[in-house]
Swiss-Prot record:
CDD domains: SfsA-like_bacterial. GO terms for molecular function: DNA binding. This is Sugar fermentation stimulation protein homolog. Belongs to the SfsA family. The lineage of its organism: Bacteria, Pseudomonadati, Thermodesulfobacteriota, Desulfuromonadia, Geobacterales. Pfam families: SfsA, SfsA_N. It comes from Citrifermentans bemidjiense (strain ATCC BAA-1014 / DSM 16622 / JCM 12645 / Bem). It comes from the Bacteria.
């Protein structure tokens, strides 16, 4: 999918209060940008990193700039957690994610579980398929790791996906790696061992674990290929 244009390049000064980041643009202007990512952004929120911001045309937004990309270890990384659902939908429709082809309808944010909303609900003659997407930005030694902070929400989603399988439905946990230097995907056991245990339990109980890597450029983010999952 195409990124909003133009994007404004700058240098990260600091990220704070989870959703805010101060950035010095290349013209010397310092702006406070919205950060659409609730994780720790380990390795991606270091002062001095080069970043790309979009800018909303809305006159009512307190922070019109939004942080879209960061350059980490020489690689552009997509940090916007609103993109994975859109990327997954696009890749399902164009056949990139072949494991999820053949469904007649895709709906988003459908209520399920205990007060949750599934990212994507696929339906067709083969039944229902519940798809939970996760944005991955952390890479160590060529392996993409999730989560980058303890994720009670992620743990809850795995339990709910297992329940969907018990009810006779198909359930998929889909990791979207928004950087090109990840060659495989693994749970970040050192960061959230409970999540790692639940991910393995989910896989053993019928939840399908998929990982796809995105090609990230200054103008576009698109899923390009599946990655092996190391459990």
């Amino acid at each position: 999918m195409k990124l909003p244009q133009p994007l404004f390049q700058g240098t990260l000064i600091r990220r704070y209060q989870r959703f805010l980041a101060d950035v010095e643009l290349d013209d010397g202007t310092v702006v406070t940008a919205h950060t659409p990512n609730t994780g720790s952004m380990m390795g991606c929120a270091c002062p001095g990193n080069r970043v790309l911001l979009s800018k909303s045309a809305s006159l009512t937004r307190k922070y019109p700039h939004s942080w879209e990309l960061v350059q980490a270890d020489g690689t552009w990384v997509g940090i916007n957690t609103q993109l994975p659902n859109l990327l997954a939908r696009e890749a399902i429709l164009d056949g990139t994610i072949s494991e999820l082809s053949g469904y007649q309808q895709i709906r988003g944010e459908v209520p399920y579980g205990s007060g949750s909303r599934i990212d994507l609900l696929l339906s067709g003659e083969q039944g229902l398929c519940y798809v939970e997407t996760k944005n991955v930005t952390l890479v160590e030694d060529g392996v993409a790791l999730f989560p980058d902070a303890v994720s009670a929400r992620g743990q809850k989603h795995l339990r709910e996906l297992m329940e969907m399988v018990r009810q006779g439905h198909r359930a998929v946990n889909l990791f979207i790696v928004q950087r090109a230097d990840g060659a495989a995907l693994a749970p970040a056991d050192a960061i959230d061992p409970v999540y790692g245990r639940l991910l393995r339990e989910a896989a053993q109980n019928g939840v399908e674990i998929l990982a796809y890597r995105a090609e990230v450029t200054r103008t576009e983010v698109r899923l390009e290929r599946a990655l092996p999952v190391l459990l």
